[in-house]
Design a protein with these regions (language model features):
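C-terminal engagement/docking regions of AAA+ P-loop ATPases
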Residues: 225-250
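Walker A/P-loop
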Residues: 28-69
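Non-catalytic interfacial helical region
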Residues: 24, 28-29, 67-230
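Short, solvent-exposed coil/turn linker segments
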Residues: 11-12, 62, 70, 218
Length: 250
C-alpha cells in the first residue's frame, strides 16, 4: 500500500501545494519548449521538489523514458553512459527523455566538469532536472563555486514561508479528513506544519502513523488546561510556564 505522501502526490501542476510562484515560473518556461534544457530546483525537504521534477519530466517524456539518478553515483563513466543513452527515444507518445538527479549538492568535482560541457549541448528531446535541499553558490563540498553549473540551468527556488505553510496545513487537514482522522481545528494543523518545519511529507507520515493524533490530542489538553486556569497565583504562574514550555517544545 502506498504511503499517504505517494497516494496524494499531485499528478498535475494545479495540485502542487504552497508553491504558486514556482509553478508559474515552471509553466512559463515549459510553454517555450520542453527539451534541450536543464533545471535546478532547490528547497527544504518536503516542499515539493520531487513532485515538480516529476511533473516536468511527465510533460515531455513517457514514464519508461524517465530515469532517476543519485548525484553521488554520477561518475564520469556513468555520465558517459547517460550521454550515450540520449540516442534512444520513444517512437510514439511523448518523445522526450528525462533524467532526474537527486541530492545534486552531492555531485563530484569530476562529474561537474563533464556536466558543464554536457549541458551546453543537450539534444532537443532531452531534459535534466537537478534537485537539492541546498541553495546558493557554495553548495559542493569539494567544488566551492556552483555558479558555472547552476547558470546553465533554469533555476527554481521553492518557498517555505507562512503562505506556503498555510497551504500545506489546509492540504494536510483535507487528507486527514479523507482518512477519517478529524476533530482538530485549523490551528492544530498550522502548528503541526511548523513542528515539521514546513515538511508536508513528514506531516503526512505522522498522520499515517498516528503520531499526529497523539500529539494533537496532548496539545489540546494542555491548551484547555491553560485556558481554564483560575486567577493568577504563584503556583499557577509556575504551571503556566510549564504548559507554555510544553507547547513550544511539542
Amino acid at each position: 500500500m502506498a504511503s499517504l505522501s505517494e497516494k496524494y502526490r499531485p499528478r498535475h501542476f494545479a495540485g502542487v501545494v504552497g508553491q504558486a510562484k514556482a509553478v508559474k515560473q515552471v509553466q512559463a518556461v515549459l510553454a517555450r519548449g520542453w527539451g534541450g534544457r536543464a533545471w535546478w530546483i532547490s528547497g527544504a525537504s518536503g516542499t515539493g521538489k520531487t513532485t515538480i521534477a516529476n511533473l516536468i519530466a511527465d510533460a515531455g517524456a513517457d514514464p519508461f523514458f524517465v530515469e532517476e539518478l543519485d548525484a553521488q553515483v554520477l561518475t564520469p563513466a556513468k555520465l558517459a553512459e547517460v550521454e550515450r543513452s540520449f540516442a534512444y527515444r520513444a517512437m510514439s507518445g511523448r518523445p522526450g527523455k528525462a533524467y532526474l538527479v537527486n541530492e545534486a549538492h552531492g555531485l563530484r568535482k569530476d562529474a561537474i566538469r563533464l556536466l558543464l560541457v554536457m549541458l551546453e549541448r543537450l539534444p532537443e528531446h532531452v531534459c535534466i532536472v537537478f534537485t537539492t535541499t541546498n541553495a546558493g553558490e557554495l553548495l559542493f563540498s569539494d567544488e566551492g563555486d556552483a555558479a558555472p553549473l547552476i547558470s546553465r540551468c533554469t533555476q527554481i527556488k521553492l518557498e517555505n514561508g507562512p503562505s506556503s505553510r498555510k497551504a500545506m496545513a489546509i492540504r494536510a487537514q483535507k487528507i486527514a479528513r479523507d482518512q477519517k482522522i478529524d476533530g482538530f481545528d485549523d490551528a492544530v494543523y498550522a502548528d503541526a506544519v511548523d513542528q515539521c518545519r514546513g515538511n508536508l511529507r513528514m506531516l503526512l507520515s505522522r498522520i499515517e502513523s498516528g503520531a499526529f493524533v497523539e500529539d494533537a490530542t496532548q496539545r489540546r489538553t494542555w491548551r484547555t488546561e491553560l485556558a481554564a486556569m483560575p486567577v493568577e497565583t504563584k503556583a499557577n504562574a509556575k504551571r503556566r510556564r510549564e504548559l507554555a514550555e510544553l507547547l513550544d517544545a511539542a
